[in-house]
Amino acid sequence: MAAKELHFNVDARAALKRGVDQLAEAVKVTLGPKGRNVVIDKKFGAPTVTKDGVTVAKEIELADPIENMGAQMVKEVATKTSDLAGDGTTTATVLAQAIFREGLKNVTAGSNPMALKRGIEKAVAGIVEELKRISVPTTGKKEIAQVGTISANNDPEIGNLIAEAMEKVGKDGVITVEEAKGLETTLETVDGMQFDRGYLSPYFVTDPEKMEAVLENALILIHDKKISAMKDLLPALEKVAQLGKPLLIIAEDVEGEALATLVVNKLRGTLRICAVKAPGFGDRRKAMLQDIATLTKGQVISDEVGFKLENAVLTDLGSAKRIVIDKDNTTIIDGAGEQKDIEGRVREIRGAIDKSTSDYDREKLQERLAKLAGGVAVINVGAATEAEMKEKKARVEDALHATRAAVEEGIVPGGGVALIRAQHVLKDVKVAERDEQIGVDIVRRAIEEPLRMIVQNAGGEGSIVVEKIRTAKETSFGYNALTDVYEDLVQAGVIDPTKVTRTALQNAASIAGLLLTTEALIVEKKEDKPAAPAGGPGMGGMY
């Protein structure tokens, strides 16, 4: 085992502070509408140009192992805030640096770190309650567009696209971000339920121009096993043929004699029919087939419950107004399912999401929920170059997270103003001793820091702006750094999701509290490697 190096008390905290400051200084230049760019060197390809705090933070590794510890702990603040709220990473970093810096001065002057930490926690709890009180629910498309615009570094095109997507698919809908082939950034929405399985044979196509099979007012047969023998399918097919309605067969697979017979009947015009494979795999496939059955008011014909395919009757089949199948996807529009059954199924999936511990499972459950409850929207991000594409895609993803957070917990005035507005509650925080009061005062000073930084990046003087806003009476009065005017920020569209501001403060205080109460550091000792031996003499005339 390699030898370790130990550092204690003042030395340890001073080294941590150097690391925290290096990371924070690189990140906080990006804060606000007039934040500066950071250029990150890449081993391959063009350098990345970004104004996204978490992207900058993730790239930072310091040479000194102790300083690097401090930097990594603050990086944790940025990434945790990004994961939970999707935005506010730079604000969280600025707050963590400010709380740690002010706290360190007091610890060095003899304050008890544990009492400071208790004071910081009490102050943060008070501010979080006040943020919830001044929070306003997001109701309209306009507010969602404003939140998206701010999170996408003041790009109204992205804000409007996200608002439109949310309006179309609802708050439970899935919105995905893809790279477009051209320069335009566009929005595509899919009504109804879509799954990624296409027709099993191109002979099923009804529209040769678009290479699509379109079935109007169709019945749907859902089976969880392979269909290869025609005799199993025949009874159901005869009943459907008598009705004269189109039929979609969804099964694990349709092959051999069964597929050939279906194709022949389709080509002769005896049946309007199409067959597709069931979506998903294993248990997820069973669940997705049950979702389709609920949506279309059908039954999953399954041997597992003693339900054989040859015994299927018309009432076991689902139905939908329109079904569109291309070579890759099947879309079921306007299924005949009862609303109460669909809502029951949605509640089941929501329960499973709450209990799920795996991110992957949760994502898949969320997709199923969207297909049942809302719909699916795809934002195709277009740009002129690869570097611009990456940067823009990251901004769209940030803005998407932030708008979801706004819908969840509401909005507060942006531009660092909400924290200043919540400052007054700190005078009522009950403390047990003087050092706890110092902890409360540390937070009082630290929550001004995001506003100071926004003003500083815009070329102004932070202290003057903070004082002017603190003495104003209106809750949403603040400084709009983009236009350089004082105005009602909510009306001007400068708003932040409450969840973003709350998460940034809580995460920053948590890590700063840990850093302040650190008394020892253990790092691996650097080994003094001996110089490499010089090369040996040449081998003479040997070949």
Curated annotation (Swiss-Prot):
Binding, ATP: 30-33, 51, 87-91, 415, 480-482, 496
Q: Which reaction does it catalyse?
A: ATP + H2O + a folded polypeptide = ADP + phosphate + an unfolded polypeptide
| Key word Transferase present | no
GO MF term set:
ATP binding; ATP-dependent protein folding chaperone; isomerase activity; unfolded protein binding
Q: Which UniProt keywords apply?
A: ATP-binding, Chaperone, Cytoplasm, Isomerase, Nucleotide-binding
- InterPro entries the record matches: Chaperonin_Cpn60_CS, Cpn60/GroEL, Cpn60/GroEL/TCP-1, GroEL-like_apical_dom_sf, GROEL-like_equatorial_sf, TCP-1-like_intermed_sf
What EC number(s) would the UniProt record show?
Answer: 5.6.1.7
Broad class of where this protein is predominantly found: cytoplasm
Name of the top EC class for this enzyme: isomerase
Q: Which Gene3D superfamilies match?
A: GroEL, GroEL-like equatorial domain, TCP-1-like chaperonin intermediate domain
GO biological-process terms attached to the record: protein refolding
Instruction: Spell out the GO cellular component terms annotated for this protein, sorted alphabetically and separated by semicolons.
Output: cytoplasm
Pfam families cross-referenced by the UniProt entry: Cpn60_TCP1
Q: Where in the cell is it found?
A: Cytoplasm
Q: Does the keyword Transmembrane apply?
A: no
Q: Which family does it belong to?
A: Belongs to the chaperonin (HSP60) family.
Note the subunit structure: Forms a cylinder of 14 subunits composed of two heptameric rings stacked back-to-back. Interacts with the co-chaperonin GroES.
Reported function? Together with its co-chaperonin GroES, plays an essential role in assisting protein folding. The GroEL-GroES system forms a nano-cage that allows encapsulation of the non-native substrate proteins and provides a physical environment optimized to promote and accelerate protein folding.
The name this protein goes by in its record = Chaperonin GroEL
For this protein's source organism, the top of the classification is: Bacteria, Pseudomonadati, Gemmatimonadota, Gemmatimonadia, Gemmatimonadales
| Gene assigned in the entry | groEL
